[in-house]
């Protein structure tokens, strides 16, 4: 019934002409988590964040097991937060997404400020999710 998130890496492109973007790596650990809408990446807290900046998912590793409940459990959903949230990917079991099929693009729209945040909903799940993200050009050096 707990979730813990840790930012392992938050880089930005070196200062200079046209310098923008960067990479972020986040580790999410869960113990029999049933929490909906857990904030796992607060984009405004990342280096170089500006209004309208978005994060795209480039790679993911995960190892998830079912918690104590027995129905429809043992999986998580990652989604991009917006006026209407957009599901990025659903994860179950153990695996990885290596990005060879391309990044998972943050396609949310907002009528107001764009947060760029990523949330996770867990369904009776224990384990971890390691997420590698790419900052778009709205992140400044």
Mark where each language-model region is:
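Short, intrinsically disordered N-terminal pre-domain segments
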Residues: 1-29, 141
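Surface-exposed ligand/attachment interfaces on beta-rich extracellular proteins
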Residues: 17-19, 32-52, 70, 76
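A short beta-strand element within beta-rich, extracytoplasmic domains
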Residues: 54-66
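Exposed beta-strand and adjacent loop surfaces of beta-rich binding modules
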Residues: 57, 73-75, 128
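Short, surface-exposed beta-strand/strand-loop-strand elements in extracellular ectodomains
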Residues: 67-91
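An anionic, turn-rich surface loop/hairpin at beta-sheet edges
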Residues: 85-107
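Noncatalytic modules at the cell exterior or secretory-pathway interfaces
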Residues: 104-128, 136
């Amino acid at each position: 019934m707990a979730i813990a998130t840790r930012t392992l890496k938050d880089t930005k492109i070196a200062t200079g002409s046209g310098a923008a973007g960067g990479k972020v790596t986040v580790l999410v650990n869960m113990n029999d988590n049933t929490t909906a809408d857990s904030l796992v990446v607060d984009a405004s807290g990342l280096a170089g964040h500006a209004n309208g900046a978005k994060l795209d998912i480039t790679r993911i590793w995960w190892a998830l097991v079912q918690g104590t409940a027995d129905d429809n459990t043992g999986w998580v959903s990652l989604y991009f937060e917006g006026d209407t949230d957009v599901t990025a990917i659903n994860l179950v079991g153990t695996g990885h997404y290596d990005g060879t099929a391309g990044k998972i693009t943050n396609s949310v729209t907002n009528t107001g400020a764009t947060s760029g945040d990523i949330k996770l909903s867990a369904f009776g799940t224990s384990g971890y999710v390691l997420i590698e993200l790419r900052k778009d050009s709205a992140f400044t050096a």
